[in-house]
Amino acid sequence: MSERKSDPDRDDSERAFFGRRKGHKLRQHQAELIDHLLPHLALDIAGEAPGNACEIFDPAASDVRLEIGFGGGEHLAAEAQNFATTGFIGCEPYVNGMAKILAQIEAGNIANIRLFAGDAAELLAWLPKASLSRIDLIHPDPWPKRRHWKRRFVQDRTIAAMARVLKVGGEFRFVCDIDDYCAWTLSHLARSADFKWLAERADDFRQPWDGYTMTRYGRKAAREGRKAAYLRFRRS
């Protein structure tokens, strides 16, 4: 798998950039999973997408969900095991994260996950219209410096891209412990006629939704006293 070195100050506004492509050196078995298991699960978006995203999976899924930037994969793996007839697409450009989800897929014999190691914006453009029931973005890179805000995933263009692929009634769910990025996300979604924030009272965004699997990063943030917001937006 090739790496692309990126200049964080370069204006690359068409790219939804998450962060580093590779971190710690992979252990031998992790490298073997990247070499031998990933090719069987990786989506190839060079060709035309299927007319129905459920057909990405074999057997065909009852519906399809996407997790963007799944990190260590704890949430993605748990959701796939809890909803066995749903197909899950995990998007993660960080090689170490990809190795971690592959290990969980192997250990749990999980058959309903497909993976994409590239740019989420390209994946969203490839997927059929109204093909997803849900998109999750959990603890994304907040890019705290003002000059890097253009690299945050939540932008007007990505909101429009998500609106295109979500079914009416589908949801975009966002979890973040950085207040500024939460406010950024709320303000950007408020500008879109395609989404409605579902919170009716404070606990609706202060507490995880039912069945939420806490990630390793989420537990670390809680230990350090950072409170996350759990935002849900319905495609209208």
From Swiss-Prot:
Gene3D superfamilies in UniProt: Vaccinia Virus protein VP39 (3.40.50.150)
Pathway terms, separated by semicolons: tRNA modification; N(7)-methylguanine-tRNA biosynthesis
Catalyzed reactions: guanosine(46) in tRNA + S-adenosyl-L-methionine = N(7)-methylguanosine(46) in tRNA + S-adenosyl-L-homocysteine
Signal peptide residues on this chain, from the entry's feature table: none
Segments for region (Disordered): 1-23
Enzyme class: transferase
Enzyme Commission code(s) on record: 2.1.1.33
UniProt entry keywords in alphabetical sequence: Methyltransferase, S-adenosyl-L-methionine, Transferase, tRNA processing
Positions contributing to S-adenosyl-L-methionine binding: 67, 92, 119, 141
Gene Ontology molecular-function annotations: tRNA (guanine(46)-N7)-methyltransferase activity
GO CC entries: tRNA methyltransferase complex
Biased composition (Basic and acidic residues): 1-17
Single biological process term from Gene Ontology: tRNA methylation
Similarity comment: Belongs to the class I-like SAM-binding methyltransferase superfamily. TrmB family.
General function of this protein: Catalyzes the formation of N(7)-methylguanine at position 46 (m7G46) in tRNA.
Name of the protein this chain belongs to: tRNA (guanine-N(7)-)-methyltransferase
Organism of origin: Bradyrhizobium diazoefficiens (strain JCM 10833 / BCRC 13528 / IAM 13628 / NBRC 14792 / USDA 110)
Taxonomic path: Bacteria, Pseudomonadati, Pseudomonadota, Alphaproteobacteria, Hyphomicrobiales
